Amino acid sequence: MTILPKKKPPPPSDPEGNGERSGSGGADSHSRSGARPRSSPPPRWAYPGNPAPPERHPAGTPRPQQASPPPCSGGSGGAGSGPLGEGALGPCCCCTGAGGCCSGPGHSKRRRQGVSAGPGAPGSSPDREDGAGNNSEDEYETAARTQAIDPDTAEQQEHWFEKALQEKKGFIIKQMKEDGACLFRAVADQVYGDQDMHEVVRKHCMDYLMKNADYFSNYVTEDFTTYINRKRKNNCHGNHIEMQAMAEMYNRPVEVYQYGTEPINTFHGIQQNEDEPIRVSYHRNIHYNSVVNPNKATIGVGLGLPSFKPGFAEQSLMKSAIRTSEESWIEQQMLEDKKRATDWEATNEAIEEQVARESYLQWLRDQEKQARQPRKASATCSSATAAASSGLEEWSGRSPRQRSTAGSPEHPDLHAELCMKPPSPAATLMLGKPPSPCAPGPSNQTCAGADRATSPLVSLYPALECRAIMQHMSPTAFGLKDWDDDEILASVLAVSQQEYLDTIKKSTLRRDSSPDHS
């Protein structure tokens, strides 16, 4: 008879351990409810001990820096490998609650501990249980880390980071608006040149994730459709999954800088090329900014535009702006020249007018001076001048009606006396004189004087003498009904001209006959 050894009794069960194991199982089933089968999520940062990535996507550049504590190992949230394993980056988030919009690659240790305690454990809450399906531990721990940073130290660190990038790399950090879409704003600024295009970038990214859901769903802890719907909100932050999707979508590497001159992470696309990467900077574990290279145009690269040359549009616009500026300057100069020419012409006209006015005034002064100078003349000229002056005054003092009534039937005695009175010799002599002393001929037969040709009154002497004589004569003697100054002056001038011509003829005959007698 064979005696078999007795089995050892099982050790007494530990109620706490059983509770923990049962709680862990419940948490695992709860966290996986409705989720796709997936591999373990990758850690947030790359470490030397991580396995190599699969063949689809090139691995991110491993960096020794760490922006957050390393992920926890063990259980379903242990470190694993995946295409996003190397180069996984924490999200840009400002969420303070369990239901935040940010998501990262690793499980939250705090979440696992809270869930493993079970729903009836002390310290557990429905909010913590409801948020257990989110993808990133930063949704729970970012607020605590942010509050622990000293504002002065953070400001100095930001200043040093910006200065180091500009001095060593020549890059400029372009600030993005802090509204939850900073990652998409930074990418939109790099691709479209306008951060307000972040909604378009977000939509394209979410559509790309949905088309490749069989691949990207392996790196999301929650239901993938729920994750995509949450990420479509404009105030929901992005993380490393969106970076990888945008790197593949635009076929441009995505470089992430965090307080250093070398990128701490690089996300590569499916195909390698020489295109300029999309550069973003990560600040205080909560915010992304755009890093711009001012010496190289990158806007439009990755949009699939045929025959597109970065910066060509800017060069064309610059040439057009320069040409427009030159044309405007030329037109302005031409307008100024026209204004100056117009002013010059107006100035010349004003000067000429002023000179003419002054010359005319000077001529009037000279005429007045010459008229006031005493004239040297013979006795005949003096008597003729006196008679002419008295006759002119008397003639001008009488009105035309008085002059016309001199020969009217109302004064027959005066008319007869005037008709019987012979004209004076001086008047007879003056009738034979030429009307102007400037006319050719013997102008100095009766009166000689140096100032006779220049005096303005000399030319009036014949007219004055004629008027003195005509005022004593009746208009009927000349076949006129009444005296008319214009007709009388015309007739007198005609008679004077005829007498002047006769005098010239006589003087010519005398000159011709004088040589014969000699």
UniProtKB/Swiss-Prot annotation:
Gene3D superfamilies: 3.90.70.80. Its EC number is 3.4.19.12. It catalyses: Thiol-dependent hydrolysis of ester, thioester, amide, peptide and isopeptide bonds formed by the C-terminal Gly of ubiquitin (a 76-residue protein attached to proteins as an intracellular targeting signal). GO terms for biological process: protein K48-linked deubiquitination; protein K63-linked deubiquitination; proteolysis; response to lipopolysaccharide. Residues 116-125, 377-390 have a biased composition (Low complexity). Transmembrane segments: none annotated. Residues 231-241 are annotated as: Variable-loop. Keywords: Hydrolase, Protease, Thiol protease, Ubl conjugation pathway. Residues 282-287 are annotated as: His-loop. PANTHER family: OTU DOMAIN CONTAINING PROTEIN, OTU DOMAIN-CONTAINING PROTEIN 5. Belongs to the peptidase C85 family. This is OTU domain-containing protein 5. It comes from Xenopus tropicalis (Western clawed frog).
